[in-house]
Amino acid sequence: MNVEVAINDKKTMEIIAYEMKYVNNRVEKSDIVCIPFEVEFFQGYMRIYNECFYEMRKALDIQPYNFLNEYNQIVEKVKDIYLLLNQGEITGSVACYGNEIDDLIVNKKFQHKGYGKQLLLWGMQHIRAKSNEPITLHVAEWNNDAFMLYKKVGFEIANVEKIR
């Protein structure tokens, strides 16, 4: 539950995030194939990334609301970012940093069609191919749809973190 607290006459929403872990060795098979990130897709990726996180960042007053605006913000991370394409258009993306899944996004026009789950499973398989360590991810309490997906797939809360 989010709680509003008055700080210096400004209302600030408390931000709670869950660290979640998947400890099973077996991962359900994904029906998709992702490709490594390529710079030619940056503009589309940036648009989708910002669209996906805008509502949450605004609701939680995390500024800037449109965080991603330059390639150099992700240049060190692109080797771990994977894209799902549909006829050359980005359907979604998932980042796999070691044993952590991050920045799982689905193009708004493809949402609610199962791509989020498929990207999650693909990322989990990608990690499992290299390691049997627990797979981790973080999700804001605000993002209940993502939280419920992660629980349904088998992730469990390992830690509750108060961000602000």
Where do the language-model regions lie?
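Acyl-donor-binding surface of acyltransferase catalytic domains
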Residues: 1-31, 164
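Conserved beta-strand-loop-alpha-helix junction that forms the acyl-donor binding cleft
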Residues: 1-3, 137-147, 163-164
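A short beta-loop-alpha structural element at the N-terminal edge
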Residues: 33-47
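Helix-loop element at the rim of GNAT/NAT acetyltransferase active sites that forms part
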Residues: 47-60
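Active-site rim helix/loop that mediates acceptor-substrate recognition in acyltransferases
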Residues: 57-90
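Conserved beta-strand in the GNAT
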Residues: 83, 88-105
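A short, internal acetyl-CoA/4′-phosphopantetheine-binding micro-motif in the GNAT/acyltransferase core
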Residues: 104-112, 140
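Conserved acetyl-CoA pyrophosphate-binding loop and the N-cap/start of the following alpha-helix
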Residues: 110, 114-123
